[in-house]
Curated annotation (Swiss-Prot):
Protein name: Cyanide hydratase
Family, as annotated: Belongs to the carbon-nitrogen hydrolase superfamily. Nitrilase family.
Induction: By cyanide and propionitrile.
Organism ancestry: Eukaryota, Fungi, Dikarya, Ascomycota, Pezizomycotina
Residues at the catalytic site: 46 (proton acceptor), 128, 163 (nucleophile)
Length: 356
């Protein structure tokens, strides 16, 4: 039986820009802080390590190259010692960790999320299915075996999505069908509505993400919804500006966008513009009952005989091996990267259950 009442935290802080080691240490520090505060769950923003490359929205290709090279050099592999250190921190603090990071696998980057258990096991490893707009210049697409979001945990059925995935009706439908109870709506860093210039739509600023998309997700799915957000400082603005370009000097518009919402879409907490740290919430899963009694889109309030969603969770490799009966060999990113193995052991020690 899952816990029904527990404390959770959402991170709203500035990443360690372009610095993998500093990012890992800052992540561990926050995990320690949340653990000491009695939290059972901590949620980090989208690509928290090594920070969201917002510069790609503001500069041209030639200007981006030095920053892109450094960004790739400081992205994190899941079979790395850095990732194992974060898993150990989760184990040491007996806490679930929802981590967003720029994952490097072979020569491609992915907008990745991992859900780490209090024993250090990787309960889920997913990749954003489609990078947004100019993000395609930095990241690749997730595959069939890396986009599932919701997994059963001792805290309830917990799901994760990145940025505009949280307003994708098909991904929301998939999460609802899994009976999601707690949702991590991980967001990057981007500016507020003060920066809007016609004809750029309000879709492209932080305020609708915080105050429209995220509470809509909560009320439509009937889930506790944590929305961690990155922040920026004046120094961070300089670090995210290429040489020869005048940096912005006021980071205020980038800050104060993290939120936590109840299953009925009502606001629990939002930070001041100058707040950097953890937002806390006392979760009671039983609050999901009445919202889902009114509208459960995976049960009594849906018509699967009329509307259904086709999902393909198979991975398609560029090169595949033939098997008997004219079939092809099945591939698993999870197994290839060793995420099915225990944190400090070998294949002979034990097998970690594959996330559903």
């Amino acid at each position: 039986m899952p816990l029904t009442k527990y404390k959770a935290a959402a991170v709203t802080s500035e990443p360690a820009w372009f610095n993998l080691e500093a990012g890992v240490q800052k992540t561990i520090d926050f995990i320690n802080e949340a653990g000491q505060a009695g939290c059972k769950l901590i949620a980090f923003p989208e690509v928290w390590i090594p920070g969201y490359p917002y510069w790609m929205w503001k500069i041209n290709y030639q200007q981006s190259l030095p920053m892109l090279k450094k960004y790739r050099e400081n992205s994190m592999a899941v079979d790395s010692d850095e990732f194992r250190r974060i898993r150990r921190a989760a184990r040491d603090n007996q806490i679930h960790v929802s981590l967003g990071f720029s994952e490097i696998d072979h020569a491609t980057l992915y907008l990745a999320q991992a859900l780490i258990s209090p024993t250090g096991e990787v309960l889920n490893h997913r990749r954003k299915i489609k990078p947004t707009h100019v993000e395609k210049l930095v990241y690749g697409d997730g595959a069939g075996d890396t986009f599932t979001s919701v997994v059963p945990t001792e805290l309830g059925r917990l799901g994760q999505l990145n940025c505009w995935e949280n307003m994708n009706p098909f991904l929301k439908a998939l999460n609802v069908s899994a009976g999601e109870q707690i949702h991590i709506a991980a967001w990057p860093v981007y500016p507020g509505k003060e920066t809007l210039k016609y004809p750029d739509p309000a879709t492209n600023v932080a305020d609708p993400a915080s105050d429209l998309v995220t509470p809509a997700y909560a009320i439509e799915t009937g889930t506790w919804t944590l929305a961690p957000f990155q922040r920026l400082s004046a120094e961070g603005l300089k670090m995210n500006t290429p040489e020869g370009v005048e940096p912005e000097t006021d980071p205020t518009t980038y800050n104060g966008h993290a939120r936590i919402y109840r299953p009925d879409g009502s606001l629990v907490v939002k930070p001041d513009k100058d707040f950097d740290g953890l937002l806390f919430v006392d979760i009671d899963l039983n609050e999901c009952h009445l919202t889902k009694a009114l509208a459960d889109f995976s049960g009594h309030y849906m018509r699967p005989d009329l509307i259904r969603l086709l999902v393909d969770t198979r991975r398609k490799e560029l090169v595949t091996e033939a098997e008997g009966n004219d079939g092809v060999k099945a591939y698993s990113t999870r197994e290839r990267l060793g995420l099915n193995l225990p944190l400090d052991g070998s294949k002979e020690d034990e097998k970690v259950p594959v996330a559903l």
